[in-house]
């Protein structure tokens, strides 16, 4: 049993733990060996490494997870997928995949972070051979942090432009408008106009001032990826403002972040409720909601419906990015992460479903006003946020008010997802640094460098060809394919290499009881099968990226996209092969050595406290040659 001296915080080893050598990282990060207190060594007097932060209140963790996981995809992607894939029928595959895939991995990542007290890389000290999973998640979340903020920059630009008497995208006659721009939004206006051989639908879709504002003013869209053009300085300033805001949300750690999310995570719900009340009072709103929920049972047999449900679950739950692991690492060791994970998953899916009523009540009104079928106005992604909804608000009384509310909500939804993503990346990065590299203002400088690097990369997305770069990042770097690959390996490593029952015991050590066996079965069988099935389908039916159904990317652009995807997917096999080749002994000996967990000091502390109650069984060496490996994180 490990005992801790109250005077100097040094552990001693007795009982079974004396069967093998105790390996501990010293102040300089190099391992030192010992058979008791001497092996651990006294704390270095030349270092003053602060202890790892914890949330001030557990609600800080809940709100941070809500802010991170509940983002733009819940508002602009789920409602469209639900409508496209059979309305209410889509909820059947969505709920089933959430139960067998989304919730189990969501819980797995949070509990791993809480148990190991480490970010996305060092959390895999639980099975060091597969530490490539941590590097992969760092690559993915870095890509997400880089391109996701562009949506915030565009939203911020629209928000600023909303504070006018007349919305700039509501009228023609501006410098960015073409001679063909026509201000026709309502069907009766179109019917009374002289259109010279063009139908109402063609004119409204092709030459709307909303589209021209988006393409000619905001994006200044060039002819392709090979024509980057110049910087759009107005959008660049909005991008810079967003990065400065993110920096000051993250620079002081979870103590400050946990306070900010109380506003950024809750106020969007207030705006959603206000927009729903406004939307359902508009003519045609009921028709829109019916289209949203109307079941089409024939869709249930389509593989694409199940693929869309699975991809949406993994993307909206923010699985595989390492940020949930980082957030969980700041929990107290005995926090009930099982209950938290269930609550957070329900909030996430519930928000997606609720947002559908908001979106389709507005789209129903828009379709009624234009006299077209709702399929003509239903869009997903940026098309919904920056074309469909801006067009809809031009039809409402006091249009600038509703535009400002919508884009403010959009900004907040993306902001907390962005700064929590940055927090996840910074946590993993700082956990890698040995204690001897700790210096004052380490975190502040690291966050500044990360934000500055991402901003420089983002400059490629505020050029005339920037939208094509943005689509490359979105389609390849953090796609469903990469997230499914990541989730598959997470389940395999925990369930089959480390041991599902073993990890269930570890969770019991933290929360006082074993979770439902369903979680173990999912980690071991159901979730890996679901992940691999959807992954294979995505690869077999892969379609090259095409922008706006017209622009086909050049071969080198597609190669760049696959480089983004493979840069994370290859981390796992390359790290595994590298470790096995560098290790000594037979292959079985290498495997046994490299899958031996590396424990932190807090594991010994809680084993000492709870040995007579429930025990931390995974810390007990199983043979004379086994060992307990202990490291202490920098942060």
Swiss-Prot record:
The chain crosses the membrane at residues 61-81, 88-108, 139-159, 231-251, 270-290, 305-325, 342-362, 395-415, 445-465, 480-500, 521-541, 561-581. It comes from the Eukaryota. One of its GO terms (cellular component) is apical plasma membrane. It is found in: Cell membrane; Apical cell membrane. Glycosylated. Keywords: Cell membrane, Glycoprotein, Ion transport, Membrane, Phosphoprotein, Sodium, Sodium transport, Symport, Transmembrane, Transmembrane helix, Transport. CDD domains: SLC6sbd_CT1. The modification Phosphoserine is found at residue 623. GO terms for biological process: amino acid transport; creatine transmembrane transport; embryonic brain development; neurotransmitter transport; protein catabolic process; sodium ion transmembrane transport. Residues 1-47 are annotated as: Disordered. Residues 1-60, 109-138, 252-269, 326-341, 416-444, 501-520, 582-635 are cytoplasmic. It catalyses: creatine(out) + chloride(out) + 2 Na(+)(out) = creatine(in) + chloride(in) + 2 Na(+)(in). Expressed in the small intestine (at protein level). Expressed in the brain, heart, skeletal muscle and kidney. Expressed in the leukocytes. One of its GO terms (molecular function) is creatine:sodium symporter activity. The modification Phosphothreonine is found at residues 617, 620. PROSITE patterns: NA_NEUROTRAN_SYMP_1, NA_NEUROTRAN_SYMP_2, NA_NEUROTRAN_SYMP_3. Glycans are attached at residues 192, 197, 548. It is a multi-pass membrane protein. Pfam families: SNF. Residues 82-87, 160-230, 291-304, 363-394, 466-479, 542-560 are extracellular. Belongs to the sodium:neurotransmitter symporter (SNF) (TC 2.A.22) family. SLC6A8 subfamily. Creatine:sodium symporter which mediates the uptake of creatine. Plays an important role in supplying creatine to the brain via the blood-brain barrier. PANTHER family: SODIUM- AND CHLORIDE-DEPENDENT CREATINE TRANSPORTER 1, SODIUM/CHLORIDE DEPENDENT TRANSPORTER. This is Sodium- and chloride-dependent creatine transporter 1. The lineage of its organism: Eukaryota, Metazoa, Chordata, Craniata, Vertebrata.
């Amino acid at each position: 049993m490990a005992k801790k001296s109250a005077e100097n915080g040094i552990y001693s080893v007795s009982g079974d733990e004396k069967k093998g050598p105790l390996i501990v990282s010293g102040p300089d990060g190099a391992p030192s060996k010992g058979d008791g207190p001497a092996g651990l060594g006294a704390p270095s007097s030349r270092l003053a490494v602060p202890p790892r932060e914890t949330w001030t209140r557990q609600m800080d963790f809940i709100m941070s997870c809500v802010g991170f996981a509940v983002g733009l995809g819940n508002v602009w992607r789920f409602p469209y997928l639900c409508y496209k894939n059979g309305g209410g029928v889509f909820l059947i595959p969505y709920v089933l995949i959430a139960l067998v895939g989304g919730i189990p991995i969501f819980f797995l990542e949070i509990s791993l972070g809480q148990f190991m007290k480490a970010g996305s890389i060092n959390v895999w000290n639980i099975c060091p051979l597969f530490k490539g999973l941590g590097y992969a998640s760092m690559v993915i979340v870095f890509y997400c942090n880089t391109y996701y903020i562009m949506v915030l920059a565009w939203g911020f630009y629209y928000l600023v432009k909303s504070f006018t008497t007349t919305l700039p995208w509501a009228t023609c006659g501006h410098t960015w408008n073409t001679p063909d721009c026509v201000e026709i939004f309502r069907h009766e206006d179109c019917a009374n106009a002289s259109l010279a051989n063009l139908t109402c639908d063609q004119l409204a879709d092709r030459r709307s001032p909303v589209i021209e504002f988006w393409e000619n003013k905001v994006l200044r869209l060039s002819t392709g990826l090979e024509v980057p053009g110049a910087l759009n300085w107005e959008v660049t300033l909005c991008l810079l403002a967003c990065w400065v805001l993110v920096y000051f949300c993250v620079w002081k750690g979870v103590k400050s972040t946990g306070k900010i999310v109380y506003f950024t995570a809750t106020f969007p719900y207030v705006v959603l409720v206000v927009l729903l009340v406004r939307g359902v009072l508009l003519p045609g709103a009921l028709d829109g909601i019916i289209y949203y929920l109307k079941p089409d049972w024939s869709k249930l047999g389509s593989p694409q419906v199940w693929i869309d449900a699975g991809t949406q679950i993994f993307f909206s739950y923010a699985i595989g990015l390492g940020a949930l692991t980082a957030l969980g690492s700041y929990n107290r060791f005995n926090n009930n992460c099982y209950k938290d994970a269930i609550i957070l998953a329900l909030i996430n899916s519930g928000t997606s479903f609720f947002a559908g009523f908001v979106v389709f009540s507005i789209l129903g009104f828009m379709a009624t006003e234009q006299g077209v079928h709702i399929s003509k106005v239903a869009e997903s992604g940026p098309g919904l946020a920056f074309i469909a909804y801006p067009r809809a608000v031009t039809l409402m009384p006091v249009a600038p008010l509703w535009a400002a509310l919508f884009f403010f909500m959009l900004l907040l939804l993306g902001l907390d997802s962005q700064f929590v993503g940055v927090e996840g990346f910074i946590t993993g990065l700082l956990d890698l640094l040995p204690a001897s590299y700790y210096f004052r203002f380490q975190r502040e400088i690291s966050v500044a460098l990360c934000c500055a690097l991402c901003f420089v990369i983002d400059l490629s997305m505020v050029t005339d060809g920037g939208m094509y770069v943005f689509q490359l990042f979105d389609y390849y770097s953090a796609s469903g394919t990469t997230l499914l690959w990541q989730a598959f390996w997470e389940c395999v490593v925990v369930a089959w290499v480390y041991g599902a029952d073993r990890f269930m015991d570890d969770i019991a050590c933290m929360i006082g009881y074993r979770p439902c066996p369903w979680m173990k079965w999912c980690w071991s069988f159901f979730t890996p099968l679901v992940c691999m099935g959807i992954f294979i389908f995505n690869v077999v039916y892969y379609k090259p990226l095409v922008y706006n159904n017209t622009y086909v990317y050049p071969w080198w652009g597609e190669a760049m996209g696959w480089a983004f995807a493979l840069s994370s997917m290859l981390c796992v096999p390359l790290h595994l092969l590298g470790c096995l080749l560098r290790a000594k002994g037979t292959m079985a000996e290498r495997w046994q050595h490299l899958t031996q967990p590396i424990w932190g000091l807090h594991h010994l502390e809680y084993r000492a406290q709870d040995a007579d109650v429930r025990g931390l069984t995974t810390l007990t060496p199983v043979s004379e040659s086994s060992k307990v490996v202990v490291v202490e994180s920098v942060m």
